[in-house]
Amino acid sequence: MSRKFLLVGNSHLACVKVAMDIEPGLLGGRTVDYVAFNQIDAADFDVVEGIIKPPTNTSAIPADARLGEARATDYSGFVIVGMGLSINLLASIYLSHRLLAHHRQGLHLLSRAAFDSAVAESIQKLGVNSIIAKLRAATNVPVLLVPEPLMNAEIAKDERGADVWTGEHTPFLVERYISSLHQVFDPVVDLLEQPPETIDGVFTRAEYAYGGLRSLTKRDKRGNPWRYKEDHRDYRHMNEQYGAIICRRIENWLTSRGL
């Protein structure tokens, strides 16, 4: 079997791809294909008679991140990046509901059992589960899941997010997020936790978000990767420095798997 790998993702794949464009030796020089599309289209990803069929919404797929007639068995492993696996799944619950220990006036009270059930359901509803199932039905090679990074630390300074992203409940949300990912995905795929050197408390270190990337192909007027300015209020997307760290962790995973 050839040593070729497919990276599947949404906008969070951009920092990884740009890092590899800058430093081609990342992943140990292994051959890599990419396919990118919006997470809302993930349920349309399919494998038909062994051929990988990305969503047909081509406007969501950058020109250099489309596949031709690629067979699932052409690849020695798959890496799935982002695709809605985010701490925001839990934060969205805490916008209106809280456990008793974190409760305040104006919010609905939620039991621990109901909270855990809501978290598990929100993860299981994501289209990434369909991608995994369809790849697994076509091949048994290893699959690595790379969730979205924690929020940029600068979000704690933004009054719009202060209620959810500051307070004694925030470490609890992060702990439950990570443990819930393991509970759902450990039986079926490998999971890459966020590298600790990129974490500042319960957030991603702000330095990795400056100039965050969302597009695999979009360029500025100088031909450089298009990125957000440092003061842009997108707290979820990271830059190529973060992408390079993730690439090295992916390479470690590939090596540990003998790939």
What are these regions (language model features)?
Residues 3-22, 40-45, 51, 78, ...:
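Catalytic nucleophile-elbow at a beta strand-turn-alpha helix junction centered on a G-D-S/GDSL motif
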Residues 4, 8, 116-123, 165, ...:
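Conserved aromatic-histidine-acidic binding/catalytic patches
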Residues 47-54, 158-161, 203-219:
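Charged, often glycine-rich, active-site loop that binds/positions anionic groups
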Residues 71-208, 222-224:
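Alpha-helical cap/lid subdomain in secreted, periplasmic
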Residues 212-259:
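Histidine-centered active-site loop/cap adjacent to the catalytic His
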